[in-house]
């Protein structure tokens, strides 16, 4: 039985000048998503997707690498300026923002949108090492 030829869709290059970089920095990983102003994703990257495993995912260097790869692929769509929204308490917050700037994107605003509970769920118990 012959296999059907499937035509793959080529990635369309959009011409978007300014967007939003969403940095989600948890204790275990850092995820960087770059969207246009309406929230449609242009590119994304994470420390785990780059091959960092285990505790190496939660390092500032892994966040820097994730931010660089996401910004490079977003700049192929013509992106020049970004607003940055940072969510979470992780160690990769500052290094991810610095990597966006060093990759050639102009950061216009930095916004911290970390969710703060008004005494909601009980937090996880303290670690005893």
Swiss-Prot record:
Keywords: Ribonucleoprotein, Ribosomal protein, RNA-binding, rRNA-binding
The UniProt record lists the keyword Lyase: no
Entry GO CC: cytosolic small ribosomal subunit
A Pfam family annotated for this UniProt entry: Ribosomal_S11
Keyword Secreted set for record: no
GO terms, biological process: translation
Disulfide bonds, paired cysteine numbers: none
InterPro entries found in the cross-reference section: Ribosomal_uS11, Ribosomal_uS11_bac-type, Ribosomal_uS11_CS, Ribosomal_uS11_sf
GO molecular function: rRNA binding; structural constituent of ribosome
Gene3D superfamilies attached to this UniProt entry: Ribosomal protein S11
Subunit structure: Part of the 30S ribosomal subunit. Interacts with proteins S7 and S18. Binds to IF-3.
Family: Belongs to the universal ribosomal protein uS11 family.
Function: Located on the platform of the 30S subunit, it bridges several disparate RNA helices of the 16S rRNA. Forms part of the Shine-Dalgarno cleft in the 70S ribosome.
PANTHER family from the UniProt entry: 40S RIBOSOMAL PROTEIN S14/30S RIBOSOMAL PROTEIN S11
Name of this protein: Small ribosomal subunit protein uS11
Annotated source species: Staphylococcus aureus (strain NCTC 8325 / PS 47)
Record gene name: rpsK
């Amino acid at each position: 039985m012959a296999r059907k030829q499937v035509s793959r869709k080529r990635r369309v290059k959009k011409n978007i000048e300014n967007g939003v970089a969403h940095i989600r920095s948890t204790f275990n990983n850092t995820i960087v998503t770059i969207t246009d102003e309406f929230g449609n994703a242009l590119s994304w990257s994470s420390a785990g997707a780059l091959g960092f495993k285990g505790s190496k995912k939660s390092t500032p260097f892994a966040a820097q690498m994730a931010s660089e790869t996401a910004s490079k692929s977003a700049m192929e769509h013509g992106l020049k300026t970004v607003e940055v929204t940072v969510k979470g308490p992780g160690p990769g917050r500052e290094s991810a923002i610095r990597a966006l700037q060093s990759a050639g994107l102009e950061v216009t605003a930095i916004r911290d949108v970390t969710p703060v509970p008004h005494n909601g769920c009980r937090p996880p118990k303290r670690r005893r090492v």
